[in-house]
Amino acid sequence: MQAKLIEILESSQIRLYPQFQPGDNVRVYFKIQEGNKTRIQIFEGLVIKFKKNGLSSNFVVRKISHNVGVERTFLLHSPLVEKVEVIRSNKVRRAKLYYMKKRSGKSARLKEIKRKELKNL
């Protein structure tokens, strides 16, 4: 009985996003509150981790800003995440791309693949 109730509550909070996976370059629009004002900030980078766990699914995006690696973890179904855009899909053979942290320059390149259509999660 409790499992069904939890499932019903969770299903109302799940949001639809384009399908993406580790190795994809994404642009994440998320809300930031500064004082009493709310604005949308964009974080663009490579998805190095994606954990699917129902309502608490999360993903880590890494980008290089001023020669410093910046990583940010986002909850997929958070109300603070406005939208996620897939910019480019890359061919990878791992689920977690932690080895990309050590790479820079040409060694950090990934081979692009073409996706015909994006499906919703």
UniProtKB/Swiss-Prot annotation:
Entry GO terms, CC: cytosolic large ribosomal subunit
Record-level GO BP terms: translation
Record family assignment: Belongs to the bacterial ribosomal protein bL19 family.
Organism ancestry: Bacteria, Bacillati, Mycoplasmatota, Mycoplasmoidales, Metamycoplasmataceae
PANTHER family reported in the protein's UniProt record: LARGE RIBOSOMAL SUBUNIT PROTEIN BL19M (PTHR15680:SF9), RIBOSOMAL PROTEIN L19 (PTHR15680)
SUPFAM superfamilies the UniProt entry points to: Translation proteins SH3-like domain
Keywords on record: Ribonucleoprotein, Ribosomal protein
GO molecular function annotation: structural constituent of ribosome
Biological function: This protein is located at the 30S-50S ribosomal subunit interface and may play a role in the structure and function of the aminoacyl-tRNA binding site.
Family matches, as Gene3D superfamilies: 2.30.30.790
HAMAP family: Ribosomal_bL19
Protein name per its UniProtKB record: Large ribosomal subunit protein bL19
Name of one Pfam family that matches: Ribosomal_L19
Domain of life (superkingdom): Bacteria
